[in-house]
């Protein structure tokens, strides 16, 4: 299930090293290894850089003492870690050295083919942060950062779901903000798909370039794909894997928005009873 010999970034290193590695490889996070001997030192994600945008040294940005798993661990063990800790990268370590990595998508591929009676409403467990379609991005983006979410359902004046805003949607004209891109040290500005993976960093570093006339409705995905509270988790997993979604809005029996379901929520179906 794991990806062997994953892409890494090394320490000593800089913020720009991590950002450019994410952009080139269309990733949102990376294991960090020591350049001298390849020992795992931590992990770094776009959110880590997002929270420490003024820091340049990778050793001060990355998460140290990260949770790891052994090569012979079971899928159930991995599922328990993902759902319990709500993390999105699980380094596989042997003798202190990185030998692979597991992500929620790897586990979701197993869930989509399983038979289960569990549904979306059985695993929704987090507070749902929403945005109003008419509010400026200068308000929404800091709110997303404080709430530590990468996607928000968007509502109209009547409380109806009209869209979803993710960090990948917050880009309109990369050349317009070329100076801000330089501030982040991004080299491969032509790699749009990879660039979108670090958009939270872009908007954090470039708040001084933002104006109040950029509204949520101009950047959101309209009429997003949703699931219902009674949707089977295998079907939710299939939708996520097939569409490269990390989260989806959930509707109730009266078609009202009741929350968001995340990949790490769906994985709970494989976690079993912690006492087993």
Write out the residue ranges for each language-model feature.
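Tandem CBS (Cystathionine beta-synthase) repeat/Bateman regulatory domains
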Residues: 1-276
């Amino acid at each position: 299930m794991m990806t062997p010999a994953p892409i890494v970034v090394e320490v000593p290193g800089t913020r720009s090293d991590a950002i450019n590695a994410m952009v080139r490889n269309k990733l949102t996070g990376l294991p960090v290894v020591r350049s001298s001997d390849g020992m795992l030192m931590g992990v770094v994600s776009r959110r880590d850089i997002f929270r420490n945008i003024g820091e340049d040294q990778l050793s001060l940005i990355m998460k140290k003492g990260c949770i790891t798993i052994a090569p012979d661990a079971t899928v159930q063990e991995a599922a328990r870690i993902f759902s319990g800790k709500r993390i999105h990268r699980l380094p596989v370590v042997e003798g202190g050295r990185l030998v692979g990595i597991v992500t929620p998508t790897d586990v979701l591929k197993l869930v989509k083919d399983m038979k289960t009676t569990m549904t979306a409403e059985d695993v929704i467990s987090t507070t749902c942060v929403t945005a109003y379609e008419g509010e400026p991005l200068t308000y929404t983006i800091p709110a997303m950062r404080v709430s530590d979410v990468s996607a928000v359902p968007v509502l109209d004046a009547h409380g109806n779901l009209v869209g979803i805003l993710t960090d990948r949607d917050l880009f309109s004209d990369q050349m317009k903000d070329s100076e801000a891109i330089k501030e982040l040290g991004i080299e491969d500005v032509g790699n749009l798909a990879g660039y979108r993976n670090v958009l939270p960093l872009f908007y954090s570093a470039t708040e001084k370039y933002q104006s109040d006339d950029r509204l949520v409705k101009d950047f959101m995905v309209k009429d997003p794909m949703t699931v219902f509270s009674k949707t089977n988790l295998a079907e939710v997993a299939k939708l996520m894997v097939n569409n490269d979604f990390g989260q989806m809005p959930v509707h109730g029996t009266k078609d009202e928005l009741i929350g968001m379901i995340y990949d790490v929520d769906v994985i709970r179906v494989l976690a079993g009873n912690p006492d087993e």
